[in-house]
Amino acid sequence: MTGSSKIKVALIVLNDLGSGGAYNYESGVIKDLVLAEKSPFEFLIFAPHKLVGATKQRFPDLVVRPYRSGLITMFFLSLRSSLQGYKLLKTIGLRYGRLERSLVRENVSLAYFLAPNALVLDLVDTPTINTVWDLGHRDIPEFVEITGDRHFEERELFYRHALPKSFRVVVD
């Protein structure tokens, strides 16, 4: 295949070096995908704005683009998550959030979220692959670390909305 006929896949990272296993997992998946011979895919990385420099150093042969996930992004994500909010945003020309606008600009066909990431909920048209590391919160809901500060509900809500819409789900 020529470079122009390859399917563009965005690898969406979330974690920095201080995240330990999460960072190592994301880096390992990227290395495995990039090293695959005769791949029909062209990969580019989307990293949180503050991690772009370190990500470029780690993967100098890949295009790295920034994304933001601050308060304004999360506000629009919550609006876009409801049908009424989506209709309102679509009416005023904000059908897509920042990340999806970047994906469209780059002609990305598939977004692979290498870690659980709330921004997947902001995508309207881009197909996704999502990663689930564990569902342990269901096994031990009696611990305040799991149920305190609405962590249990947060995880359940995320999985309930993100996974059914996913093209594929990777469980590790």
Q: What is each of the regions a protein language model found here?
A:
Residues 1-172:
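Carbohydrate transferase catalytic cores enriched for Leloir-type hexosyltransferases
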